[in-house]
């Protein structure tokens, strides 16, 4: 035997159900943006005029672009990153070279901090809870490689891309007793380069 319900109860029940369906649709629709990984990032090409010569290898970097990570893979809070194409060549040398993230430093005269964390992206860790970046780049003799270099600027509550549009940014590479400096006058500018 069926029970009768009032019109008011019927409308409240169907309204709540419709609201739940709409909310789940919105959450499903935005899930991809919050689970973003750097897999699909494309870095701007490097300018061949900006190459620095270390004697046994050359290095070059393109202009910076920006990416904000997912809190899912960053311990609960999203991070801001700069990234750029980074090219290394040993084409005119019989030697191979390995460059580590520790050979590179980032500085900004406007006070923003950043740490070079990756020379290419590997994927997620086995638990699917954290990004895994390559911390070194090895280039064999008479060879060349281009990877995406990643700079972690910190959490979104402590860093801002906006501050990088003013002031000067530098990326410094120290290797083989030499120091190369790539200088950016703004976030969207190609760098100038020098070596000593």
Q: At which residue positions do the language-model features occur?
A:
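Conserved functional micro-motifs across diverse proteins
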Residues: 2-4, 13, 31-196
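N-terminal export signals
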Residues: 3, 9-30
């Amino acid at each position: 035997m069926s029970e009768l319900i009032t019109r008011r109860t019927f409308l409240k029940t169907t309204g709540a159900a419709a609201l739940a369906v709409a909310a789940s649709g919105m959450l499903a629709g935005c899930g991809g943006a919050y689970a973003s990984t750097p897999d699909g990032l494309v870095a701007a090409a490097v300018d061949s005029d900006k190459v620095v010569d270390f004697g046994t290898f050359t290095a070059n970097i393109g202009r910076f672009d920006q990416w904000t990570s997912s809190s899912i893979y960053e311990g609960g809070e999203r991070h801001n990153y700069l990234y750029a194409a980074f090219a290394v060549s040993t084409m005119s040398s019989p030697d191979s070279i390995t460059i580590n993230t520790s050979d590179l430093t980032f500085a900004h005269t406007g006070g923003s901090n950043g740490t070079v964390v990756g020379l290419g992206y590997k994927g997620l860790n086995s638990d699917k809870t954290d990004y895994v970046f390559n911390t070194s780049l090895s280039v064999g003799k008479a060879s060349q490689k281009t990877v995406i270099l990643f700079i972690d600027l910190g959490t979104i509550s402590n860093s801002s891309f906006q501050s990088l549009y003013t002031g000067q940014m530098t990326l410094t590479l120290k290797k083989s007793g030499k120091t190369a400096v790539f200088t950016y006058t703004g976030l969207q500018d190609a760098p100038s380069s020098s070596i000593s």
